[in-house]
Amino acid sequence: MADQVLDELDRSLVCALQVDGRAEPGRIAEVLGVSARTVTRRLARLQHTGALRVVRLPAVEEAALGALLLRVRVLRGKVEAIAHALAARPDVPFVDIMLGGHEVSAVMLADPGSRDHLVHAQLPATGSVVEASAHAVLHVFTDAGRWRAGYLAADQTAALEPEPPTTPPPALDELDRRLLAELGEDARRSHAALAAAVGAPESTVRRRLARLAAGGLLRTHATVDARLLGMTVDANLWLDVPPGRLAEVGERLAGHPQVHGVLATSGPANLMATVFCPDHAGLYRFTTETLGPLGISRVETAIVARAVKRAGVPLRGEPAPGGRRPVRASR
C-alpha cells in the first residue's frame, strides 16, 4: 500500500487510533457515523497489510530519561547495514535513513552503561562508521505519540479521548510487565488474547489493564507511513534558538499540526523538531513561514529517505514514490 494514499474513512480510522489506540470498533463507529462491521473490516485490512500498527508507548518522561539522539555518518553503500543493526536493538525505537545515503538517525533509550558502550566503543570500532554524534534529550515538548494527522473534527477527537490518569503510576509486578510487553507488540490485542498470552484469567487481565490505564501506563501510538496520509516528506530540523526563547519556540512548534516531535537537546543545536510535509514545496513553506518569524539563528534540514523503525516497530517501507492514487474501498 506504500504507493497509495488512504481514502477518507481509512484516514479517519488512523486518526481515531492516534487518539485512543485501544478504542473499540463500536465506539469508533459511533463517532465516525459508520457501522461497527465496516470499522472492524477496515482496521483488519489496514493491520493485515502492515499499513497500520498500534503499540504501547512508555510515558513521555520515561521515554526521555537518558535518551540520546544519534547521528551516524557511514561510508556509502553501508547505510542499510548500519541502520538495520541499530534497528535490531530493543533499546533503539526509532531509526531513519537520511537522504543522501550516508547518514543514519536514531533514538536510543538505554541505561548509561549500554548507551556508553554503543557510543564510545561499538560505533567507533565499526569500520563503515565515519563519525557518530550523540545528543542528550533535555526536555520533551511533544513526541510521536501525541501527533494527530488532523482528519477528525474537534468533537470527534474529544469523544474518542481516553480517560486521563487518575492515580500515580502503580508499582509493577511480573504480570504487569508481561502485559505491557504484549501491548508493546500489539496494543489492540483483546482481553482474551492477552489472557491467553500471559496465562492469567481474562477477568484478572481486565482489572490489571484498568489499573495500568488509571496510572497512565497505557499510552498508545498508531504507527502509519505518513505517505499514506498524503505527507511525502519527513524531515529532522536541527535548530539553534536563543536560550531565552527556547521554551517559547519549543511550545509554538509543538502545537503545529505538521510537527510530530520537538525536543530540547545538547550539542550545537539546542532544539530538534521532526515535521511531516506534503512535498518539498511544503517543507520550504514550513521553513519560511513557520520557522522564519520565530527568531531562530540557524536551521539544518535533514530529510528522511526511509523510516526503518518507528516506536519500536520495524517498517517495510521504501523510498517515497513520485505519486500515489487513493485507495478505493467500499464501506
What is the role of each PLM region?
Residues 1-331:
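A compositional/biophysical signature of low hydrophobicity enriched in polar/charged and small residues
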